[in-house]
Amino acid sequence: MNRRYVFSLSAGLLASSCMGAIMPVPVARAQQASTAMTGAQATGGTAAPRQILLQQARFWLQQQQYDNARQALQNAQRIAPDAPDVLEVQGEYQTAMGNREAAADTLRHLQEVAPGSVAANSLSDLLHERSISTGDLSHVRSLAASGHSAEAVAGYQKLFNGGRPPHSLAIEYYQTMAGVPADWDQARAGLAGLVAANPQDYRAQLAFAQTLTYNTSTRMEGLARLKDLQGFRTQAPVEAAAAAQSYRQTLSWLPVTAETQPLMQQWLTAHPDDTALKEHMLHPPGGPPDKAGLARQAGFQQLNSGRLSAAEQSFQSALQINSHDADSLGGMGLVSMRQGDAAEARRYFQEAMAADPKTADRWRPALAGMEISGDYAAVRQLIAAHQYTEAKQRLTSLARQPGQFTGATLMLADLQRTTGQIDASEQEYRSVLARDPNNQLALMGLARVDMAQGNTAEARQLLSRVGPQYATEVGEIEVTGLMAAASHTSDSARKVAILREAMTQAPRDPWVRINLANALQQQGDVAEAGRVMQPILANPVTAQDRQAGILYTYGAGNDAATRRLLSGLSPEDYSPAIRSIAEEMQIKEDLASRLSMVPNPVPLIREALAPPDPTGARGVAVADLFRQRGDMIHARMALRIASTRTIDLSPDQRLAYATEYMKISNPVAAARLLAPLGDGSGSGAGNALLPEQQQTLQQLRMGIAVAQSDLLNQRGDQAQAYDHLAPALRADPEATSPKLALARLYNGEGKSSKALDIDLAVLRHNPQDLDARQAAVQAAVNSGRKSLATHLAMDGVQESPMDARAWLGMAVADQADGHGHRTIADLRRAYDLRLQQVEGSRSASGPAATEEDALAPPSSNPFRHHGYGRQTELGAPVTGGSYSMEATSPEAADQMLSSISGQINTLRENLAPSIDGGLGFRSRSGEHGMGRLTEANIPIVGRLPLQAGESSLTFSITPTMIWSGDLNAGSVYDVPRYGTNMATEAYNQYVNSLSQNNSSSSLRTQQIQGGQGEAGFAPDVQFSNSWVRADVGASPIGFPITNVLGGVEFSPRVGPVTFRVSAERRSITNSVLSYGGLRDPNYNSALGRYALNHYGSQLASQWGQEWGGVVTNHFHGQVEATLGNTILYGGGGYAIQTGKNTRSNNEREAGIGANTLVWHNANMLVRIGVSLTYFGYANNQDFYTYGQGGYFSPQSYYSATVPIRYAGQHKRLDWDVTGSVGYQVFHEHSSPFFPTSSLLQSGAQYIADSYMQNATASDYLSEETVDRAYYPGDSIASLTGGFNARVGYRFTHNLRLDLSGRWQKAGNWTESGAMISVHYLIMDQ
């Protein structure tokens, strides 16, 4: 068996087989259901409807619509409850619902009913599969994907406990086993068994046929099976298409013989445009390259790179296989000539010419040119030292010597072409052709120039004049031309198509593969990129294979694979880029080993950056080490130190540091570094850059423009964001990323329809662009076009089922449709796929606008409005993480994984019913029996999710106890200020005076009472979603006064702006009086009855048994704007306060404020702000006599505070602490003792007047109390502030404990509180 073909396909086969394994119900089972239904229809009886119902149940299980699956299963159970197939689906349903114990019971029953049946075996396999660790399975799959087939097979066997594989994993297991030569026969037998057991399992049929094609002895049988599979396009379209691709690939492996030629001709009849197969038939390669050919090819590549020792070794290896190999002999002659050994070079050339006279012309110029080889050797030394100017001067002089014009000019032209002087090189090639129109080297050189410029037709015309002896070189030039054409287009779909054509022509060319892989990554198809690179990563044959593999794995951030490939590459084969990577790997390894021994990495960073860094590799290495650990703080520090060590940075340094700055999301620093380079042409600022440097510069500039635009868009400044993006839109109208950024700007301004037009236009241009598809799905949801969003998402999943982004788009659509469980399933699928990708890279390798209108950039800034526009100074975004010596987990190191995990956790909690219980305490300052308040409550809250977690219904009941303490009955100041105790004390004074004058008086004094405790429970029902909240409830039932409470708030969001409008009726909880009301102790006393009898209905209408229980009817509006990390808000409102037997009041209030993020890392944040507040009441009711409300109600209140918030989390612990300090000024008017009763107020006035006339120093009532019947006003200015803290700890996914405390000083009161609460998710979704 040819291992080369096995490794080239193993990754693709494994990826396709994994798709079935991660489905909740394996695809093979759905196919079995379809087959069973077909057979049932033929047999008739009760089996047919039963099989149809079972097929429906399996379909709904696959769609994760479990209610529908249960209904279909129950209907089937009514027909035949003990039928083996019914029991099998019953077990599958129980497994999908997570009820493994029930599924195990079902399996035992099934084994009793039908022992050894297919149904029993299938259900047993399913239960075994579900017991396998997902993490272990992902690790084994990553081993297989990286080409470590033997290790992967051992891993699978460990998962299977040495037994046979579960049905859903059998195909991928045997496919992986087929990659181990010693196990190929066993793999074939295993797949043959699967096919025999179920001929309609098309995935097994495909895998079996493909495995047969890998071995020359069974290749024709595999071809026949692949051809048969192509006929099942209706039943199995995916497998049929894959079979066609495998069939075509296998044809290219076959020699052209009488047996194989008809097969190839049949294919060409159906596919007349397959030029590669035509070429294969005309010029059959004779099978895979022999070892001598590979060694010879490597020798010439090494020779062209100046690595003479490696080239000599390669040519000698080829000659050991075939000592008469003319090309290898000639290669040795070239090596000897460059080494300065003229005699040895002459001997090798002569032997080469004698070995193959037909190719003797290749070596005659070299033999003739040996006389001046010293000059050419000197030129080559200059080129190797990058002294291009001196080399060109020597070549120009050399061309003037007799007989040297052609050779020197061609060498000069080649040098000019490779250093980017395309026009000059074209002129030199043409000068050679002017003297010698058929000069083969000049024709090929000029063709390379035309290919590089995109002039494909002209290049091919030149190549048509090249003789067949240069067929290999001509093929390389055509491939180079295709690669140049690909580099000249920013259309990712066209670029991929061009590079696929190039790979068809040069399947083993590593540079074609890496360019195609990079193009696929830019298109978003990371999995396919890995499959393209897999052959050279798993089995690198040449040094160039390793070089390309190193560049690919380095770009993917896979340091382990990069080091592995480097270990097999000789330092002589290092290119400048590879040498830079090798140095970076060494720096990282050394620094990482020392980090574990120090508590502070800063000294090590400075030490590592002390040596010179001419290419920027050292600074990038140090910064990238910390970036990979999630430590952005020290990554930024390393880059800052590296980029400021010298004033005059080289272009290489600027490009390297800027690239790393972009990796850590700091486009501002990257732009600052690139500014001195200008446009790279040298016409303006900066020197001229090499072509590769110019390309890197352009890519960085585009990325910076997009990043800065997104940053400003987050801040809500779409106008300035467009100003940053417009140059990128103009520079490359075909580029995708600026267009998608423009769509995000429209989304940010609330113009979702316009954003959708742009996203759809990009998607029509390149349907494989998953980033564009994701954006289109979100824009469609934002525009209210949910059906379109679902259609786009489903297309993405069908086209790219192994890409996490496709499932993220599906999650957006499903959530918009209210399918919460399906949304979680989509997110979990995306998480698993992304995790596999990350672990794999770590361990190994209305009518819409027209497309033109949507894609065209606006002629002017559409986000710049008249009279609006502010210039925002861009600052570096604050990112980073705390230093840790431990390597980060995949989730912590990968932004997509972290985001998906957060979405899953949030949605899981939103979908799960929950119950909360707690115990809270509150204490408010004031006089005993009046303003002082102590409260204890036990809130019990239940929450039911609605609409896929987008909404919820919350029920709560809160037992509440409040008390104010006992009134100080001996206080001459407190007693008259409570209820109607002023009358009581006046009466008692009268009785005492009368008793002194008449000892026989029968009148008795009344008892002073005051201060009450109350208890009750407060019910409430609340509905809420993202933009509306409404509730209805009551103040505690059991208090003297109970009020119906409730409210509604609307909070629609338009772009970065949120509008809040609310209307609510709430209790004022400042005191026992305002919260629950009080009963006047005098109402039923003898004095009270006397007063009511004496004053009759007039007093009865002004005096009741209870007063208080105040509610505020509040109407409020607010606007909030989120501008990046800053939140601005402002609003105002009006309220009316009413209570039982209390004076009505009204309030006006307004406030503005802002807060901004001043620091954050991966786990913590700090925000600081400022808040300005005003409110004022019509009258002052902050007192406790009858008719007063007992709540703080100044006539004007102003405050300015500075709040600071610190929040964070660490593992299971999270916290949120806010503190504020400020200054307040408020003014209170005077207020009558009894504002609702003219009789009581006139009595109070009479008592006050009488006191002023008759009081003595020993009187019970003090002058301070009754000098007038009004409470005095006041004006106060003082500090204000407080804090609010919460600490939570999550014991399990379902259970969380919260502790909170607060203290506040405001107005004329202080308040403190504490609570302990438990949050429990009843069902873990």
UniProtKB/Swiss-Prot annotation:
InterPro entries reported for this sequence: BCSC_C (IPR008410), Cell_synth_C (IPR003921), CellSynth/LPSAsmb/PSIAsmb (IPR051012), TPR-like_helical_dom_sf (IPR011990), TPR_rpt (IPR019734)
GO biological process, one term: cellulose biosynthetic process
Cited SUPFAM superfamilies: TPR-like
Pfam families xrefs: BCSC_C, TPR_19
Annotated compartments: Cell outer membrane
Keyword line: Cell outer membrane, Cellulose biosynthesis, Membrane, Repeat, Signal, TPR repeat
PROSITE patterns in the cross-refs: TPR, TPR_REGION
Signal peptide residue numbers: 1-30
Membrane topology annotation: Peripheral membrane protein
Pathway(s) per entry: Glycan metabolism; bacterial cellulose biosynthesis
Region described as Disordered: 838-886
TPR repeats: 50-83, 85-117, 292-325, 326-359, 406-439, 558-591, 702-735, 737-769
Reported function: Required for maximal bacterial cellulose synthesis. It may be involved in the formation of a membrane complex for extrusion of the cellulose product.
Family: Belongs to the AcsC/BcsC family.
Protein name as catalogued: Cellulose synthase 1 operon protein C
Source species: Komagataeibacter xylinus
